């Protein structure tokens, strides 16, 4: 949690925890070591965090591109992702090797990614 709060402080973002028992949407290609890793957060609903994470430049509109994953298992996929999961809805990140970009995208607050 401290690393997540530090990212939020660095970018002046609100913090919203992604509890370990909640789910995020993640693309299977994240496990393949493809870069960059992209993440975006929409408003959470039900038992989800609102996070969608994928590797590569673009994500697919295919209905099975994102699979559900409990937050507690994210380290098994890519441990670098966890530090960004405290960013509030409307925030995005892109990481690749030693590169990091984090920004606010107000369009995400009206979005229905992965639906």
PLM features per residue range, with description:
Residues 70-112:
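Short, compact, well-ordered microdomains
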Residues 1-9:
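Extended, charge-biased low-complexity segments
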Residues 9-60, 69-71:
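Short helix/strand-capping turn motifs
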